[in-house]
Amino acid sequence: MYLSKVIKQDYNDNGYAIIRSVIEPDLVEEVQKHVEWLQNKYPKIRPEAFHHDLLVDDPFIHELLNNQDMLDIIEMIIGPNIALFGAHYIAKRPKDGKPVGWHQDGSYWPLEPMNVVSVWLAGTESLKKMVVCV
């Protein structure tokens, strides 16, 4: 229970919370393999463009998005009424790929109250200078 209060407080105070090792290493490896599979299936699509339209009927992405450990943490922040508005991979190769510009995800979903989270799962290690800026 203490952890849930710390996570929620971090999120409320800072607008984000960093929670490490949420999903098991085996599942991280499956995510990496899934991205590779998508790259082979859609060779003309850049990996940072693997968006909702390619994933909506994908069984693996549904398994990933229903990961109970991840859902438990989301519930700690916004409560039990969780809805998914979209899912995509931002798969970037080292020293390649377009940047994701500054934005606020909340502007895409005009909800009241704005009780929303965006979940980013890192599938590989990232250099400190290459991570999300908040």
Model segments located where?
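Catalytic core of non-heme Fe(II) oxygenases with the double-stranded beta-helix
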Residues: 98-134
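Non-heme Fe(II)-dependent double-stranded beta-helix
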Residues: 1-111
